[in-house]
Amino acid sequence: MRKTRPAGHRDGLTRRALLRTTLGAAALGVMPDATQAQEPSPDTTKRWGRLPNALGARSPAENPRRTLNPPTSSRTPLQDLQGTLTPSDLHYERHHSGLAVVDPRAYRLLVHGMVDRPLTFTLDDIKRFPAVTRTCFLECSGNFFGTREETTPQDVCGLTSQTEWTGVMLSTIFSEVGAHAGATWFLAEGQDAAVMTRSIPIKEVLGEAMLAYAQNGEALRPEQGYPVRLLLPGVEGNASVKWLRRMKLSDRPFMTREETSKYTDPLADGTARQFSLVMDARSVITSPAYPETIEKGFVEIRGIAWSGRGLVRRVEISTDGGRTWKAATLQQPVLPKAHARFRYAWQWDGRPTEIVSRAVDETGYVQPEMSALRSARGRRTRYHLNPVTGWTIAADGRVRFAVERVRV
């Protein structure tokens, strides 16, 4: 039954009255600014909300930050993220000589060597080619730290991030210059002060390699190689050379500084593993993790897994320190050479224990224990360490990094 209202009564403000109120408030300088509007209000229906901004911002209640490791890197806050995409401003950084600031109008990319037509491309030239977009992770080959119990997932392996990348296929560029059939390697050279250079085997990467000029729908950020970087899905991050300025095709590797004094794995028998480009399967539990404290009862174990070999097929969870394993649930979609999110429902009985995860990829590769890695490679390498990691849980619910598991 509809109640009657007095003649002339209207609910709220008319459009004209609302406009007068808004303009009057603006003239008096009493409109709430963006900072004020973002302050939590007991009743958001009783005050004006924030007006549109030229640039969006996070809620003040959310404060994810990269951890800084000056002067060369910063780490992604894995424990603070949802889904599988990393916001551009939280993507990890790794530099050899700081950021290169490149004028896009002056940008040039030289492609030469074993080609029919050596060419120099501008940024506009590159953007004229058919564009492709794909989602994949990047990971530094030195992405492991685990010497203290008071260590977060961000510190353990925060040198990995995942982005939607847009650019042109490397195969398109090589076709444009007429790459010779005998060309089996190419040199990628950056425009930073270190003149970062890597030799890349063409056959192994050509099907997926890109020249990327955008990430997550916007131009590359300077720390990610603006205006153009090489992108090699599944390959150690340093080979995806940023601020790309030159590619030279050859029939042999170039043996640069970065693949002799660095990024080569010395082995226990005195030999070395060179051009170990692919990042093997890995996982990390992001919650519960240090510095959390949990309570007895239901706990959801969450984390991410990835493999440079392709798809993550499964993630296994142990809640008894690795004695028994059970399958976690993978959040769909699971993409090749991409972070996959997993979860596992657990009833904690309140007794001290250790929770552990391990990934298995589509090739059957199983993420190894640190003892197996040390047995195969010795102790002189810090690259490509992807050991099984976990978290100890004390009787009072305090969570700490299981440092003894990786102290081999």
What are these regions (language model features)?
Residues 24-25, 35:
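Cleavable N-terminal signal peptides
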Residues 27-28, 179:
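A generic secondary-structure boundary signal that marks alpha-helix termini
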Residues 38-408:
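Structured, non-membrane catalytic/scaffold regions adjacent to prosthetic-group chemistry
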